[in-house]
C-alpha cells in the first residue's frame, strides 16, 4: 500500500515538525492521514453543530488506525441574506468552498477525506471539491432540524411575513413564528435545497446508506459520523475507490430519479450539473426533464407536502425511496461502502435500520399527538402522489435553452395559460407591486437581470411567497425570472430562464402586455403576442429581431471582488452556473 502522505514526508522534511507543532504525536505521522473538512461555524444552524460530528469522525479514523486533521471553510445562509444584496453571494460561495477544498487537499498531502456539511451551498460545494480533489472520500450529511410547536417550520415564515404586510396577522403572531421556527441545529426542516442535496449525496453513493437527513439532534447521526471516519481509512487502503471510480452517469440518473420522487428543490438543477462537470460528465436541464417524465413522486413532505423533513428519516429515508423505485435504478453502481447500491439496500433490510426508523416515528407521533405511518410520508409506488416527476424544463422563444418549473408545487390551474407580461428589472420593484396589488389576475410578472452573470443569481423567495400566499394571485399569475428560487418556494414560479437577460436572452426583450404562453405538459414557454394581441410565431420572431437590434447590453454590475469574477465566468444555469474559466 503506497500512501501519498508518506511519500510527501520524504520530500518535505519540514512537514513532520510542523504537524507535531499542531498537536500530532510522532506515532501519528506514519498513519493513514485523512483530511476532515467541514463547514463548521456560527453562520447558521446547519453548520453550528458540525464540530461535534467532526470529533466523532476523528474518533472513527483513530479506531481504524488513521489520523484525522481538521480543516474548515464555513458557508453562508441564504435565509439570513434573503431579501438583501447579500443573497447575491450565495451561489458564488459554492465555488469558493470547492476552491478552498482543492487548496486544502492539494497544498498538504492526504490519503483520504471526510467532508461534512448540511446546507444549500455547503453540500454541493463540498461534493464539487471532493470530486475535483479525487482522493478516497466519504460525505457526512449534517441532518435536519426538528420542527417547532404546531409543527412549525422555517419555510412558513415567508407566508407569515406576507400575511403581516397585508394586515392579515398581528406582530405578536409574526414574532411567535420567528421565535419557534428553528428550535435546533440542522438544515431547515423541509425539502428545500439543503435537504435535497443531503439526499443527493447519498443517492450518488457518496454518503453511507441511510445517513441523509436524519434529525441533527439524533444520537444515530453521531454513530454515522464515526463510521464515516472508519470507512475513509478503509477506502484509503483499497484500489479504485476514488470519487471518479464511484460516481458515474448511472449514479446521476439514480439521483435524479430520487429527486423526482422527493419533489426536490429546483436548485438541484444548478448543483448536480456542476458536480458532474467536476467528474467530466455532462448533466443538463434536459437530463432532468427526460428522467422526470413518467417518474413517480412519492414524498409527502413540505413544501410540496404536509410533513416536516425529519419525517423523511422516520419513514426510512433514501433507502425507503429507492426500494419503491428500485425497478428504475441502476443497482450495480458502486458506493462508498465498497458495495453496490443493490447490496446496500439488501443489507439494510436485515440490520435493523427500518425498525430503528419506525421507533423514531413513534416518538414523533407522541410529540405531536398524531398517528403517522411510513406510508403517510413515503407513498408506495402504486399509490404515488404523481406520475410525472416533479419538475419540467420549459422551452420556446422566451427560453431557448430552457427554464425550470416545479409543477408539483404549482396550482394545476396554471399548467396551461396565456398571461400578460409585467416586466421588472429588480426584485424590489416587483415585490412592492405584488404586495400593493399593482399586479392583477392574468399577469406574468418578470424579474430579470438576476442570472449568474447579471447579479450572481439570487433567490426570488419573498416575491414568490407573496404571490403563492395570496389567495387570488397564487392561482392566477406567474413569476418568471432568470434568477432562481428558494427550495421552499411554491406556486406558479418559473426560474433559470436561459439565456439570461444580461447575455441578451429573450427575457431581456419582453415588454409590457406581451402575451406569454405557459404549457407545462407540452413543456412550452413562448411569447405569443404583443400589446395584448395574438401574433403568429413568424411575426413574433420579426418583432424580437427588431427589439434585439435596439437592445443595449448593461454595464457589469460589479467592478471588483468575488461577484465580478463570478459574473464574468459563470456558465449557463442549464449547465450548472459553475465557474467556467
Q: Each predicted region: which residue ranges?
A:
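Catalytic or ion-coupling anion/metal-binding cores of large enzyme and transporter domains
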Residues: 1-46, 53-73, 79, 85-90, ...
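A short, small-residue-rich loop immediately preceding and capping a beta-strand
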Residues: 105-126, 138-141
